[in-house]
Amino acid sequence: MKLPPRRKLKLFLLAWMLVLFSALIVLATLILVQHNNTELTEVKSELSPLNVVLHAEEDTVQIQGKPITEQAWFIPTVAGCFGFSALAIILGLAIGLPIVKRKEKRLLEEKERQEQLAEQLQRISAQQEEQQALEQQAAAEAHAEAEVEPAPQPVPVPPQPQVQINFGPRTGFPPQPGMAPRPGMPPHPGMAPRPGFPPQPGMAPRPGMPPHPGMAPRPGFPPQPGMAPRPGMPPHPGMAPRPGFPPQPGMAPRPGMQPPRPGMPPQPGFPPKR
């Protein structure tokens, strides 16, 4: 497992602090042991027979130690403690100051980021408010223009010139199928009569075509089938009487005809009943 450099530095400093603290403890212990040995040596020298004889006159022998400030271990111990404290303070500052600075820098960056976001939000809100104001103003102007705008006036259209079309037959062109004859125009040769149109003057009946109502028979032309006799016209030989038509003068009665009714005048051309 690979540790980050920051954690490695912390562990290295902690190990050195433990080593220094252990070294100070060992040094203080050695100083205390040496001091005790020195005191015992001094006491033994004072209690030797020679010293006892020299001080025999004294009732008591007083053994007094040196003050603590005059002890040999006092200065190294105090110096070591101060040095350890200074080292701990220095190491703490060396480790803590970068951490505090990084944290402060991170807080400042976060604060700047929040301020930038707040500024962006303010700009966006200002743009939205400005856009809404412009839209409302444009809508109000459009509404006012719609109210003020007059109704469109009709555009005058100039009259179109009248075109006169000649629908009469063209010279050199055959008549078109289904084209009715024009009043006052001569009939075209070979043109058959049209149903529903009166016959043209001087137009002979066509073979296979039914005679037109009201058309008189033509001299030299045989009568057409189904053509009723005309008043004042001589009957045609071999023409049978028509139902609903009076018999023609000189026309013989036909077999199957009813006899004259009693009290009814005989029809012209019927012989008297025997």
UniProtKB/Swiss-Prot annotation:
Bias kind Low complexity: ranges: 128-141
Pfam families attached to this UniProt entry: Cytadhesin_P30
Functional description taken from the UniProt entry: Adhesin necessary for successful cytadherence and virulence.
Extra remark: Spontaneous hemadsorption-negative mutants M6 and M7 exhibit a truncated P30 adhesin.
Segments of this protein annotated with the region 4 X 6 AA repeats of P-G-F-P-P-Q: 195-248
SS bond list: none
Major localisation: membrane
Keywords: Cell adhesion, Cell membrane, Cell projection, Cytadherence, Lipoprotein, Membrane, Repeat, Transmembrane, Transmembrane helix, Virulence
Subcellular location: Cell projection, Attachment organelle membrane
Superkingdom: Bacteria
Residue windows of the Sequence repeats: 177-182, 183-188, 189-194, 195-200, 201-206, 207-212, 213-218, 219-224, 225-230, 231-236, 237-242, 243-248, 249-254, 268-273
UniProt name for this protein: P30 adhesin
One GO cellular component term noted in the UniProt record for this chain: cell projection
Keyword Transmembrane helix on entry: yes
Sequence ranges of Pro residues compositional bias: 151-161, 172-274
Domain notes: 13 hexapeptides with consensus sequence were found at the carboxy end between AA 177 and 267 in a proline-rich domain.
Swiss-Prot/TrEMBL GO biological process terms: adhesion of symbiont to microvasculature; cell adhesion
Region feature 3 X 6 AA repeats of P-G-M-P-P-H, mapped onto this chain: 183-236
Region (Disordered): 128-274
Region of interest (7 X 6 AA repeats of P-G-M-A-P-R), ranges: 177-254
InterPro entries: Cytadhesin_P30/P32
Membrane-spanning residues: 11-31, 80-100
